[in-house]
Amino acid sequence: MAAMTYHLNVVSAESRMFEGLVQKIQVTGSEGELGIYPGHAPLLTAIKPGMVRIVKQFGEEEVIYLSGGILEVQPSGVIVLADTAIRGKDLDEAKALESKRKAEEHIRNSHGDVDYAQASAELSKAIAKLRVIELTKKAM
């Protein structure tokens, strides 16, 4: 028996990252982790910086880094509108480690709520990139 699927589009301001049939996706919404399967109730939510893990029609997996965005689930399909989206294989580990180091230093030297919030957001993005790199390496 064939797996149930739905149509997924992952797009950013720069490009269309993925379009096709999937069994499920996993993404971090504003209220926590979301697993979207065929027949999911309609939903509109903000996406936190992190990753979208895609299980394609025939079971292959792909991981894409998202800097944030919007997730829309409708009966006709699912759309991920990302601010920035980068395939795991295209991320630069050295740059991500350097971004993480700079954000940690910025947090230590922050002198106010705004500085701390900005540095914390940058740290979250760097950690998310490193996690996507790690998962992409494991899949290879």
UniProtKB/Swiss-Prot annotation:
Lipid bilayer topology: Peripheral membrane protein
Superkingdom classification of source: Bacteria
GO molecular function, a single term: proton-transporting ATP synthase activity, rotational mechanism
InterPro entries per record: ATP_F1_dsu/esu_C_sf, ATP_synth_F1_dsu/esu, ATP_synth_F1_dsu/esu_N, ATP_synth_F1_esu_C, ATPsynth_dsu/esu_N
CDD domains hit by this protein: F1-ATPase_delta
Keyword list, A-Z: ATP synthesis, Cell inner membrane, Cell membrane, CF(1), Hydrogen ion transport, Ion transport, Membrane, Transport
Cellular component aspect of the GO annotation: plasma membrane; proton-transporting ATP synthase complex
Record's subcellular location: Cell inner membrane
Main location class: membrane
Record-stated family: Belongs to the ATPase epsilon chain family.
Job description of the protein: Produces ATP from ADP in the presence of a proton gradient across the membrane.
Assembly and oligomerization: F-type ATPases have 2 components, CF(1) - the catalytic core - and CF(0) - the membrane proton channel. CF(1) has five subunits: alpha(3), beta(3), gamma(1), delta(1), epsilon(1). CF(0) has three main subunits: a, b and c.
Protein name: ATP synthase epsilon chain
Gene source species: Photorhabdus laumondii subsp. laumondii (strain DSM 15139 / CIP 105565 / TT01) (Photorhabdus luminescens subsp. laumondii)
Gene coding for it: atpC
